[in-house]
UniProtKB/Swiss-Prot annotation:
Entry's family note: Belongs to the eIF-2-beta/eIF-5 family.
Protein name: Translation initiation factor 2 subunit beta
Organism listed in the record: Thermoplasma volcanium (strain ATCC 51530 / DSM 4299 / JCM 9571 / NBRC 15438 / GSS1)
Claim: Repeat is one of the keywords in the record: no
Encoding gene (name): eif2b
Keywords linked to the UniProt accession: Initiation factor, Protein biosynthesis
SMART domains: eIF2B_5
Single GO MF descriptor: translation initiation factor activity
InterPro entries named in the record: IF2/IF5 (IPR045196), NA-bd_OB-fold (IPR012340), TIF2_bsu_arc (IPR004458), TRAM_dom (IPR002792), Transl_init_fac_IF2/IF5_dom (IPR002735), Transl_init_fac_IF2/IF5_N (IPR016189), Transl_init_fac_IF2/IF5_Zn-bd (IPR016190)
Record-annotated TRAM domain positions: 144-202
Length: 208
């Protein structure tokens, strides 16, 4: 049975790999900073915005909150009203990108934010995944899954081979014998990187 799960896991990774083969086509440039008095200038701010395809006002709002200072955009440049190191800027930009831009499943930057009621969803154009946006704190509080443990997941799509797929805590979980829209309790059988194979323990319909 272990060999069967290993084969399923390799097949699952091949499926994800083929569906996201172009995720590296978008490259985010490193912030180019200069000093003007006490201010820090990101000379290529608009270049970064053009790549990540986000509202610059939202990025500025995030950086203002994180850096605790006044920030304004001037043309293609961003003016930060205090001295900030390149390392600090990279850390904050990576935090923004990993929360609001990068797909939680395949890592693609080709995403957009959509509203569903009061919930903001990160929608991936590369793999089709849709996830409520999580803060870094929320990720840390519930990161990871473990082999042998049980989790309740919702099947978000069904692959061409009939296997259900669920997105959970940054993992793509393949669950054979499930249908799109089902909520099931599963046991994790095998994990490799950010892909897992699971089997159904119970279904919501089983409790009715």
């Amino acid at each position: 049975m272990t060999d069967s799960y290993d084969k399923l896991l390799e097949k699952a990774k091949d499926v994800l790999s083929s569906s996201t083969k172009n995720i590296d086509r978008l490259k985010i440039p490193e912030p180019e900073i200069i000093r003007e008095g006490k201010a820090t200038i990101i000379r290529n701010f608009q270049d970064i915005i053009d790549i990540i395809n986000r509202d610059p006002d939202q990025v500025i709002k995030f950086l203002t909150r994180e850096l605790g200072t006044n920030i304004v955009q001037n043309g293609r440049r961003l003016i930060i009203n205090k001295k900030v190191t390149l390392e600090e800027l990279q850390e904050k930009m990576n935090e923004y990108i990993n929360t609001y831009v990068r797909c939680y499943e395949c890592g693609s930057l080709d995403t957009e934010i959509q509203k569903s009621g009061r919930v903001s969803l990160l929608v991936c154009k590369a793999c089709g995944a849709q996830h409520p946006i999580h803060t870094v704190k929320e990720f840390k509080e519930e990161e990871g899954i473990e082999e042998g443990k049980e989790y309740t997941v919702e099947i978000s799509e069904v692959g061409s081979s009939g296997e259900g797929r669920a997105s959970f805590r940054g993992f793509t979980i393949f669950v054979p014998g499930t249908k799109k829209g089902e909520t099931v309790k599963v046991k994790i059988k095998k994990i490799k990187n950010d892909v897992a194979i699971a089997e159904v323990v119970s279904r919501t319909s089983d409790k009715k």
